[in-house]
């Protein structure tokens, strides 16, 4: 049940809304009074949220399939008659891969999901967003700006999402459509848990992830959701921005080389 009215009467589409960050965004918009369309290619999570949250509906959609995306937009308009906000959250972070372990085919598939899925939905939604003078929120990643080891394809796709956000903000400003992105850092999600489980010491990996932030913890999906509602509602003078939801992970100096790296440190004269 909605507990607020910050976005009451508005209609929001959230891709990848069935779990993790997407589910946190769905909950935040429902709690702000919006009607939310949950888009996901995994039916189980989306259906469960639909049953749990009055004001939310689920539409099965794979954002890499343009026909699915066309149906998503047309069905949203058929049901609600308007569209005020699109949150492009659907994406994937593959397990760690050295550059020589990646493939062009795998890179293309990740581009289809992380970048072109965002492009396709945004393009098809723009006629309706222009009518409502709505907004687009793209979920990028901190690593799109600062890099990440053993993640070349992922980092490239997320850097492109941030760049596309800024370009689209320029193109859509004359229509009153705002375009922003959120770049999360370490957010505790099922995906993070799955990736940690692949490591030799999952507990140590999780601890390392927590200590990467000056705040000493990972973020929660609800905190990304709160940022999305802010961008959609109060942030009327913000367009083309990258809002970092990172716990300060990008701040300060840190050890970048492996601790086993041989170094020839100079002696300090006594």
Curated annotation (Swiss-Prot):
Keywords: Carbohydrate metabolism, Cytoplasm, Fucose metabolism, Lipid metabolism, NAD, Oxidoreductase, Steroid metabolism
GO cellular component terms attached to this protein's record: cytosol
Superkingdom of the organism of origin: Eukaryota
Enzyme class per UniProt: oxidoreductase
Active site: 154
A biological-process GO annotation: steroid catabolic process
Pathway(s) this gene product operates in, as recorded in its UniProt entry: Carbohydrate degradation; L-fucose degradation
Tissue-specificity statement: Highly expressed in brain, placenta, liver and kidney.
Annotated InterPro entries: NAD(P)-bd_dom_sf, Sc_DH/Rdtase_CS, SDR_fam
Keyword DNA-binding in annotation: no
Subcellular localization: Cytoplasm
The protein's role, per its UniProt record: Catalyzes the NAD(+)-dependent oxidation of L-fucose, yielding L-fucono-1,5-lactone, which rapidly converts spontaneously to L-fucone-1,4-lactone. Can also act on D-arabinose and L-galactose, with lower catalytic efficiency. Does not use NADPH. May be the initial enzyme of the L-fucose degradation pathway in mammals.
The name this protein goes by in its record: L-fucose dehydrogenase
Organism phylogeny: Eukaryota, Metazoa, Chordata, Craniata, Vertebrata
């Amino acid at each position: 049940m909605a507990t607020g009215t910050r976005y009451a009467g508005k209609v929001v589409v959230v891709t990848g809304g069935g779990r993790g960050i997407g589910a946190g965004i769905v909950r935040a918009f429902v709690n702000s009074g919006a009607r939310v369309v949950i888009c996901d290619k995994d039916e189980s999570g989306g259906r469960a949220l639909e049953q749990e949250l009055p004001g939310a509906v689920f539409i099965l959609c794979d954002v890499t399939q343009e026909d699915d995306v066309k149906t998503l937009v047309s069905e949203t308009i058929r049901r609600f008659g308007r569209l005020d906000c699109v949150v492009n959250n659907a994406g994937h972070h593959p397990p760690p891969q050295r550059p020589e372990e990646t493939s062009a085919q795998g890179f293309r598939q990740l581009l289809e999901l992380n970048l072109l899925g965002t492009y396709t939905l945004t393009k098809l939604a723009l006629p309706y967003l222009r009518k409502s003078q709505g907004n687009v929120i793209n979920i990028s990643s901190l690593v799109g700006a600062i890099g990440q080891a053993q993640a070349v394809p992922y980092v490239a796709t997320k850097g492109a999402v941030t760049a596309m956000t800024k370009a689209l903000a320029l193109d859509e400003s004359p229509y009153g459509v705002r375009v922003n992105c959120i770049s999360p850092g370490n957010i505790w999600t099922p995906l993070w848990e799955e990736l940690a489980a692949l490591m030799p010491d999952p507990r140590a990996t999780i601890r390392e992830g927590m200590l990467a932030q000056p705040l000493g913890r990972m973020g929660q999906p609800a905190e990304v959701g709160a940022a999305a509602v802010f961008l959609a509602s109060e942030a009327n003078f913000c367009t083309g921005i990258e809002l970092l939801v990172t716990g300060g992970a990008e701040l300060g100096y840190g050890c970048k080389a492996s601790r086993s790296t041989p170094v020839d440190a100079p002696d300090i004269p006594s």
